[in-house]
C-alpha cells in the first residue's frame, strides 16, 4: 500500500511511531540457523534481493566468521514489515550462538524487548538454547519460538506428519520448561509459548517457508501442501520458488513478531524499573517508563563496532526516552564527560543512513564519538548544561568470568604502541576480553573465556589489524579462599605504631550464591560502598545479615565482603579508606600465589592508631592491614580453587568409549550420558587446566564428528596432590618466593 515511498522514507516515518516498532533479537544454539533466518527475513522485507538470501550471509561481517562458520559479532539490521494494513519497523540484532561469546548475547539483549528463539527440529533444545534464553528472560525480554530445519524431517528423515507434530510438541514443552524456570515471576505464565495462540512457528530457513496456526487459519495453507511440494519438486530451487508462493518465511515470522512481541512503549513500562535503579518519579524515570519522545534524552550503548580500516568506531545504542539529535551535546554518565554526537544514523537493511534525530524506542548508530563504551548511559544535560544527577543504567553483566590468560607481545618491539591501541579497540567491542599489564613483569596479559576465544582475538589482531604477535601458552586463572574461620589476627604497621585486628571467614555457600546473583542483577553495588542507603541495607539483610552488620558493610569486591565492626575508635574515619584499599589489594592478589580471592568475609574488629596523622599514612596502614588479612587467611586454612567447565559433548554413539576415555584422561568426570539413535550427548565436568587444546583432541578422537559446548563454569578446590605443583608453577611464573608459606 505504501510501496511508492522509498524504503528509507518508510523507515524514517516509522521512527516516530513507537507503537509500530519492535526491537528484537534472534537467539539460538550454534548452527541452529539464525544467520539463514536473518537473511531470509531481510530479503522478504525487501531489503536484500531474494536470490542472495541464504547464500550471501550478509550479516557475516568478519572473514574469520566465515572461516569458522560462526557468527561472532552481532550486527544490527532494520526492516519494514506490513501487518494488517500498517507498517512496522523491525530492528533486529543478530546474536552469536557460541557460548564463548556469551558476552555479546548479554549486551545484545539489553537493546531488545523480544526474541525469536530458534530451535533446530532435529537437534532439539541444546545447551546454548538454555543459556541464551536464560539471559534474555533475565533482562525481561519476551520470547516467541521458531522451530527450524523442518525440511529435514520431510526429506531426510521421512517422518510421517504425526511424528513431526509429536516432535514439535516436545520442543514446545521443552522451551516452556525453560520459561517456567527462568522467566520473571510475573511472566512465567503469560510468556509460555503455544502453537494455538500463534507464539510458535515452524519451517525451514534454508528453503524459506514457515507455518503458524494463525497463518494456517487465515490462508488455509497447511503442512500437507508443503509436504506435497517436497514430494514433487525437482530440486531445492523449485522448492524455494513454490513454498515462497504459499507460505513465505518472512511473513509468518514477522507477523508473529509484530503480533506477539511488545513495542518499546509497552516493554519499557516493565523493563525500565528492572534495568535502571533511579527514581521512577523523576522526569527521567517518567519519560523512560512512557518512552516519551518529549522527555529528556536517555540512550544506552549496547555495542561498539570498530571499522578495521578506518578504525572509526560506531556505537549501537537504544534510545529510552527523549530525542537524540545530530550535533547535540550529551553527558556520558560512566565516562563522566560531555561530548557532541557528531553523526546519528539508523539502519535500512544492513546499510546505515544518516539522520537528524531519533526518538525514544529506536535503535541508532552513533559515530564520530571516541570513548563510547558498551554499557555507557548517554543523557541530555540539564537545561543549564550540567550533568543530570541520575544513576547510569545498570552495568551489563556477563555470566562467565574470563579464566584463561595469555601473555602477548608484538614480534617487532616497535609495534608495541600499535598493539596497545588495537587491544583497546578490540576490548571496546568485546568487554568479556580482559586486558591488563602485569605490574611486576610489564607483560601484556589478555584473558578470555577459553582458548578458542583468545584464538579468535589473536586472529583479529594479526589479520584485521595487521600486527604480528607472539603469544605465550594459555595460563589458567585460579581463585584463592579459605576453609574455615580465624582471627582476630593482629597486623602491625612498619613503624609499629598502629595495629589492626582482622577476622576472616569462608562465606557460606548459600550466601555466596545469593550474593553472586544480587551482583549479577545489579541489586548490590560492586566496590567501595560510598553512600549506604536503605535499598542496599535491605538487600544485605535479605542475605541474612542483621541491620547493624549491613550498615557496617564497607566494600563488596570480587565476591568478597568487608565489614568495619569497630566502635568508637578515634581517627578511624581518617584511615578507613586505606583499610578498604588494603582489603581490595589482597582480594586482587591472594596470599597463596597472588591469584584473586573469592567467597571471603573479612572484618576489622579493632584497631590502635597513633594520634599523629604523620605516623598513620598509607605507607603504614596498608601493609599492616594486608598482613593481618593474609595471616588470618592462613590460619583459616588456605584453599586454591580452579575453574572447572561443565561441557556437553555431542558425538555419534560409536565414540562414547573414546570420549569417556578422553575425559577421564583429563581429570574429568562424566555426569550424564544420553543416547539417541544416531548421537550421544555426554555431559562432563573438566578442569579448565585440562581443557586447553580439547577441541583438537576431540576432533581427532572422533574423526572430526564430535563437537562440544560449554554449559556452565564453576570453581572447585584443586586436588591435594596437585596443590604444591600448581602453586609452584604460578609463583615461578610470577617471580614470587617459592618456599614461603604465604606471599
Ligand atoms: N536443512 C536445513 N539446514 C539449515 C536450515 N537453516 C540453516 N541450515 C543450515 O544450518 C547451518 C547453520 O546455519 P546458520 O544460519 O549459519 O546458523 P547460525 O545459527 O547462524 O550459526 P552460528 O552463527 O554459527 O551460530 C548451515 O549449514 C545452514 O545452511 C534449514 O532450515 N534446513
From Swiss-Prot:
Belongs to the TRAFAC class translation factor GTPase superfamily. Classic translation factor GTPase family. EF-G/EF-2 subfamily. Residues 19-265 form the tr-type G domain. GTP binds at residues 28-35, 94-98, 148-151. CDD domains: aeEF2_snRNP_like_IV, EF2, EF2_II, EF2_snRNP_III, Elongation_Factor_C. It is found in: Cytoplasm. The modification Diphthamide is found at residue 615. SUPFAM superfamilies: EF-G C-terminal domain-like, P-loop containing nucleoside triphosphate hydrolases, Ribosomal protein S5 domain 2-like, Translation proteins. GO terms for molecular function: GTP binding; GTPase activity; translation elongation factor activity. Keywords: Cytoplasm, Elongation factor, GTP-binding, Nucleotide-binding, Protein biosynthesis. It comes from the Archaea. This is Elongation factor 2. Catalyzes the GTP-dependent ribosomal translocation step during translation elongation. During this step, the ribosome changes from the pre-translocational (PRE) to the post-translocational (POST) state as the newly formed A-site-bound peptidyl-tRNA and P-site-bound deacylated tRNA move to the P and E sites, respectively. Catalyzes the coordinated movement of the two tRNA molecules, the mRNA and conformational changes in the ribosome. Gene3D superfamilies: 3.30.230.10, 3.30.70.240, Elongation Factor G (Translational Gtpase), domain 3, P-loop containing nucleotide triphosphate hydrolases, Translation factors. GO terms for cellular component: cytosol; ribonucleoprotein complex. InterPro entries: EFG_II, EFG_III/V, EFG_V-like, EFTu-like_2, P-loop_NTPase, Ribosomal_Su5_D2-typ_SF, Ribsml_uS5_D2-typ_fold_subgr, Small_GTP-bd.
